[in-house]
Amino acid sequence: MAATAHWRQLTCSGDVPTGRIGHTLVTNTAEDTVYLYGGVNDSNEQNSQYLQDFFAFSFADKSWRQIEMSGEVQMPRAFHTAVFYNDQLHIFGGCNGRGRFNKLFSIDPTGRCSMFSPPPNAKVPLTRYCHSATLFEGKMYVFAGKCGGRNSNKRLKDMMAFDFATKTWIEVEQVGADVPARSAHAAFTCGRRMVMFGGRSSEGECCEDIYHFSYDTCMWQKIETNHGPLFGRARHSVVVHNGRVVIFGGWNGKKKLNDLIFYNMDSETSEVVHDPDETCPSRRECHVAVTCQNTMVVFGGRFRGNFMNDTCELDLGTKSLKDYCRDWLLQHAVLVGDSERTSLPRRIVDYMDKWRALVAPELQHRIPAPPSDSSPLMWIRSRMPSAR
């Protein structure tokens, strides 16, 4: 039986942002607000309108609110990246009609901007756009992207990490599989690894490969899969929710898409998901999606010259027992002990053993000082909704 999903096309109130592409969305820690920054509306290619506006979307009442920016306000830009850390958005890179950027700055929820100024002669990333940025243990990892002009095929495959504690950039020495240069790909953190796939190659073709990158060993591993045609796209949106990757839309080198794909990390299986109510958003590329309270929120994108400003939601479901077990395993990075094995269903133990592959080998036998919630059952019970 084919998987189904139900989309909601929202009628939002307030200061709804104008249609755009190349913007960023991030969710705050409380998961009650989604922030939008920047982008471009270039329906008139002779006069592209690059944006530097800042909006907050209230998940509860489905309203948008524009926030006036202050402080060290930066130039308009699109195809930058953003992560949310320490109650701030951290924006890196991007481009506009005048050039490309490699500066890092932050925006707090009130709209105040602060610029990061590296020391003289410090190593910093190259200018870029259509790159990716992931967050792991207080560091932002920037990978690949495009560094040439609008019609250039020059793409990167380097990686730099920004340490928020020391406020320094670190060049990451990548080992393992040789990942081809690309832009407009997708990358996200899952466990102690980055998962990266898709994008556009230096030859201008859509990449069908998928890779894992270990944050602990800096090693890339190519994942052999028969799902290449599904992953072969660029300018798409991706979120990860409870071990399941949710892919929506994009461009496959021939046409714009509005398909929805679920890829299960544990079983390495994928399925195309259908909406029986036929409320799926229209075909689009260069849109953005985030998760908020077990829901995927999608905004914007482009199709046939139309720059959209619709807001759509897709329910992703609440956590299962298996999901809580995975969270415990990835947080503690230890083996499931004999006593825990006897207190959990066999299928759950097998599932957790499989997810140990997301923990670096040198950490698999690390036993932390026993916290009060070191037992998986205690930890899970304290976090399930019925326990609160």
What are the residue ranges of the model-derived segments?
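Short loop/turn motifs that recur once per blade in beta-propeller domains
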Residues: 11-20, 68-77, 96, 117-128, ...
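Entry beta-strands of beta-propeller and related beta-repeat scaffolds
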Residues: 31-37, 88-91, 139-142, 193-196, ...
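Beta-propeller blade signature
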Residues: 50-62, 102-112, 155-168, 208-219, ...
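Beta-propeller and closely related beta-sheet repeat lectin domains
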Residues: 21-26, 76-82, 126-133, 158, ...
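Short, solvent-exposed loop/turn segments at conserved positions within beta-propeller repeat blades
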Residues: 44-51, 97-101, 150-156, 202-207, ...
